[in-house]
Regions:
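Glycine/alanine-rich phosphate-binding loops at beta-alpha junctions
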Residues: 2-23, 32, 40-55
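Short internal beta-strands
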Residues: 28-36
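A generic structural signal for well-ordered alpha-helical segments
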Residues: 52-53, 117, 210
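Hydrophobic beta-strand scaffold residues
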Residues: 59-60, 92
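Donor/substrate-binding cores of folate-linked one-carbon enzymes
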Residues: 2-4, 20-23, 72-190
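Short beta->alpha connector loops
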Residues: 10-13, 64-66, 78-82, 229-232
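Short acidic low-complexity segments
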Residues: 60-70
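Internal anion-binding site segments
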Residues: 178-283
C-alpha cells in the first residue's frame, strides 16, 4: 500500500501551511470539514482548505471517526476537530501558534497580543490524548511589538514555516512539555467591542482581532467594524475614556471596507452633527 502524508485543516489560517507542504511533498492527501450551509439561499459553502484542494487538484476527504489506513503521518494546522485517542494510531503533529506550554487552546496569537507579550512563536508537537500537551519537536520564537497585528504574526509564522520546512525533522527529537496551566479561550462577539476600553486596551483589541474579528465600536444599534488604527492625528478621533483613538480602516454598517477619514468626509453635514454627539466623535 502506498503511504501518504496527510494534512488536517479547516479555515483560512490552515491554507499557507498546506501550500508549503503541498510544494514539498509528492504524496499528500488532505482531510478537512464538510461545507457549512449559510446565507439566505441555504447553500453549502466549502471552507478555504477545500477550495485550495480543488484549485490544485489535491485529493481530499471529510473528517470522520476512522483514521485513514494509508497514512504515514499527519500534520494539523487550525483544524476544527479534536482527535480522540482512538484516532491517533499513526502520529499526527500539530502546528500551534505559541511557545508551548504557554497559551494552550484556540486563540494563542490573539491572547498574546491582548496580554501585550513581547515574544511568542510557534510549536510543532506530537498530538496526544490531551489538548496541546504532546511532546515538542520544533519551536521558534517570534517577537511581538506594540505595532504587531494578528495578521502580521500569522504571516511571520507562515514565512518561517515555509523557509524551514525542509529542515524540520518530525521524528528526530521529542521534548516533553513542562506542566503549566496556561490556556486560552474561544472569543465571542462581545469580546470584540472597544467601547469600555481605555486607549491602550482598544489598540490591543484592534491588533489582536483583525483576523478573527474585527474589533467593533458600538453606536446605539449600529456596529462600526475596525480593521486598523493610526498614530497620526486626523480630524475624526473617537474618544475613549477621554483619550483620542484615530481609526484608519473600517467597515461601516451596510458598507464595504474603506478608509475611515473618507467615510467621515462622506457623511452629510446634518447627519455628521447627530453622529458625533451619539458616539463621541471629536470633529
Amino acid at each position: 500500500m502506498i503511504k501518504y502524508k496527510y494534512f488536517y485543516g479547516s479555515d483560512i489560517r490552515s491554507v499557507p501551511f498546506l501550500e508549503t507542504i503541498f510544494n514539498n511533498e509528492e504524496k499528500l492527501k488532505v482531510i478537512t470539514t464538510k461545507p457549512k450551509v449559510s446565507g439566505r439561499g441555504k447553500k453549502e459553502k466549502p471552507n478555504p482548505v477545500e477550495n485550495f484542494c480543488r484549485e490544485n487538484n489535491i485529493g481530499f476527504s471529510y473528517y470522520d471517526s476512522s483514521p485513514p489506513e494509508d497514512m504515514e503521518y499527519g500534520i494539523s494546522a487550525s483544524f476544527a476537530h479534536i482527535f480522540p485517542e482512538s484516532y491517533l494510531i499513526k502520529p499526527i503533529f500539530n502546528i500551534h501558534l505559541s511557545i508551548l506550554p504557554l497559551y494552550k487552546g484556540p486563540t494563542p496569537v490573539e491572547t498574546a497580543i491582548l496580554n501585550m507579550e513581547s515574544t511568542s512563536g510557534y510549536t510543532i508537537f506530537l498530538i496526544d490524548k490531551h489538548i496541546d500537551t504532546g511532546n515538542i519537536v520544533y519551536q521558534k520564537d517570534i517577537d511581538i511589538s506594540e505595532e504587531t497585528y494578528a495578521s502580521d504574526f500569522y504571516k511571520f509564522v507562515n514565512e518561517d514555516f515555509k523557509y524551514n520546512y525542509s529542515n524540520i525533522n518530525l521524528f528526530n527529537h521529542f521534548k516533553p512539555q513542562d506542566i503549566v496551566d496556561s490556556k486560552t479561550k474561544k472569543f465571542i462577539k462581545d469580546d470584540f467591542y472597544i467601547n469600555l476600553c481605555n486607549l491602550t486596551e482598544a489598540k490591543a483589541k484592534i491588533r489582536a482581532f483583525n483576523v478573527l474579528g474585527p474589533a467593533i465600536y458600538k453606536n446605539n444599534d449600529s456596529n462600526l467594524k475596525i480593521h486598523s488604527y493610526t498614530d497620526e492625528k486626523h480630524s475624526f478621533p473617537i474618544l475613549l475614556q477621554g483619550e483620542e483613538l484615530y481609526l484608519e480602516e473600517v467597515t461601516p454598517p451596510g458598507k464595504k471596507r474603506m478608509n475611515y477619514q473618507d467615510y467621515c468626509r462622506g457623511l452629510k453635514w446634518k447627519y455628521q452633527q447627530v453622529f458625533k454627539q451619539q458616539i463621541n466623535f471629536h470633529f
